Regions:
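Acidic, proline/glycine-rich low-complexity IDRs
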Residues: 1, 14-27, 85-123
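Short Lys/Arg-enriched alpha/beta "domain-start" segment
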Residues: 2-6
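Short, intrinsically disordered low-complexity segments
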Residues: 12-85
Length: 123
């Protein structure tokens, strides 16, 4: 289960993101950031930190359909922070995030490209 945290004014866009991740086979629960909800250490947190005015469904939809993750242009409209949970779900979630961000994920304070070998730091 992927928990998405968003400020009140970002909930609609976070819900659009939930629909896209659901299409990747990921169960998503959108929560308002101010709820004080606490997670177990092994659960993924995807926090929507900033979303620009563009609609996520319009921006992400066409890029997801049929495009290899590494070819999809990195989306500047969305900045996210997350922690990757342990297997078996960590790899699936990382791949789904990579599809949404053009093959790049932000983890442990750095951008990394997702490949078959794992995460490769991008300088």
């Amino acid at each position: 289960l992927l928990y998405v945290f968003a400020a009140e004014n970002e909930l609609l866009r976070a819900s659009a993101l939930r629909e896209l991740l659901a299409a990747e086979g990921l169960e998503v629960d959108v929560r308002e950031r101010a709820t004080g909800f606490r997670l177990a250490m092994d659960e993924l947190v995807w926090e929507v930190r900033r979303v620009r005015a563009s609609d996520l469904t319009r921006e992400l939809g066409p890029r997801l359909r049929g495009a290899p993750a590494g070819v999809v242009t990195a989306l500047r409209q969305v900045e996210v922070g997350f922690a990757i949970p342990p297997e078996p779900h960590g790899a699936r979630v990382t791949i789904a995030i990579a599809r949404l961000t053009g093959g790049l994920v932000h983890a442990r304070g750095a951008w990394s490209r997702v490949s078959d070998a794992g995460l490769e730091r991008v300088e």
